[in-house]
Amino acid sequence: MPQTRPPLGAVASYSFPKPQRVTVGGGTVVAVDVPGQQLVSLRLVHPHGGAVEPLDAMGVNVLTSEVLEDGPDGNSSLAPALERHGAEWTSRVNWDGFITGLDAPANRVNEAVRLFADAVRRPALNPDDIVRRREQLLERFWLEAATAGTLAMRSLGGQLFTGRYATPLGGGPVRLADITPETVASFHAESIASVAGTLVVVGDLDGIDLEELGKTVFGDAASVPERESSVPAPPPGELPRVLIVDRPGSVQSALVIAHRAPSRSQVDLPRAEGISEVLGGMFTSRLNMELRERLGYTYGAGSRFDLRRDSGVFFMSTQVEADTTAHSVTSSLEQVAELRESGVTEEELTAVRESNTVGLPVSYSTARSLAGALVDMVVHDLPDDHVDRNRAGYERLTKESLDSAATEYLHPEEAVVVVVGDAERLRQPLTDTGIGPVEVRDPESLWT
């Protein structure tokens, strides 16, 4: 048998399908026809994410999203009803949007959508269901926070922002516990039931009447109101600085090194995400090669941007043994400084280009992935050809453009270092790094 690999074929070109838009009452249907794709994905986007929650109702988005799954009849009735049509419910909340949806066979879409519309517009919202879901979320919060990496990420908001972003998306244990069934009902009536939103539909649309789908989902709901946006202020305090979230006796530490970043609309995405990939977004990234391959401190280290409508965050993260914590922090910051000073290599440039262009036909090969891209466009007011523009931006990347991105988007001098670990063991080594003042907090005191 031959022992050589067959030659690689030419890279397939890719263009994101152009969506069609249909205005129906107070809402808009955004659809992509994919002939032969018999599993249709529908997503309803409301612009009421966690960022616009009032401070006395933090977490109401997440709790309402959970409660909708109880359906119009309550007591977790929605999933079995949808299953009779081969459909599956989905719901999620982020800082900028409240997204509900379903995946259903094309020949059962109409029946499934009627159930979906009832669940979104006319849910039971039984007080017992709301209290049950709230208690489940509270229990889940601390179960998830038992993982050091999760606790570190949830501790980050209050170090970078004041206002809503200072508390985790789910509201934190104290704020979430204060939400009553009446609060959920009021939020749902004002922000979900009475607001049409945008309906994303992707799949084989032969025989599917988009206008009728829109009428079923939107009903007489009003159009989406304008959202007021303002950049949240940072908390007081010296930068850079270190926060230790104390876990006595822990033999490992979870690290997050982060700083504020521009909003989604303010960044050149290929340049910003490209330089993040060089630093920590690939196996061959600078952080992984240093902390994992050379020093042997971790199984993996990474970095990425979290870009929102009104602000953003850049962060690096890893988990290491306690005794290597301080050196891991300084080594990570040194990698950023070196990247800002010396720039990227030609090999890194090629890797960034190829990883964000070659795989696009596979990345957008399913109705769900196409729907996800359309939801992103709706949430961030992106043009219909956003994916193609983004691909072209990656293809245009040069060493010079990535080098300038390193100095424009990476700011270690503004960083906050969050370490979850044994404070007694970590305080002095982290103080000795000279990064900045070191504060120690107990996890239960973070979200009072």
Per-region residue spans from a language model:
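M16/insulysin-pitrilysin zinc metalloprotease superfamily fold
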Residues: 71-74, 102-136, 282, 302, ...
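Histidine-acidic residue clusters that define the catalytic metal-binding segment
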Residues: 2-22, 158-197, 229-234, 360, ...
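Extracytoplasmic
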Residues: 16-19, 24-27, 37-41, 55, ...
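Acidic/histidine-enriched segments that form metal/cofactor-coordinating
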Residues: 79-187, 235, 334, 348-372
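M16/MPP (pitrilysin/insulinase) zinc-metallopeptidase core fold and M16-derived inactive scaffolds
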Residues: 41-106, 127, 169, 281-297, ...
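An aromatic/glycine/proline-enriched structural segment found at the starts
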Residues: 1-14, 169, 193, 198-263, ...
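Buried hydrophobic packing residues in well-ordered domains
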Residues: 26, 44, 62-64, 82, ...
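His/Glu-based metal-binding/catalytic segments typifying zinc-dependent metallopeptidases
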Residues: 29-48, 57-60, 64, 143, ...
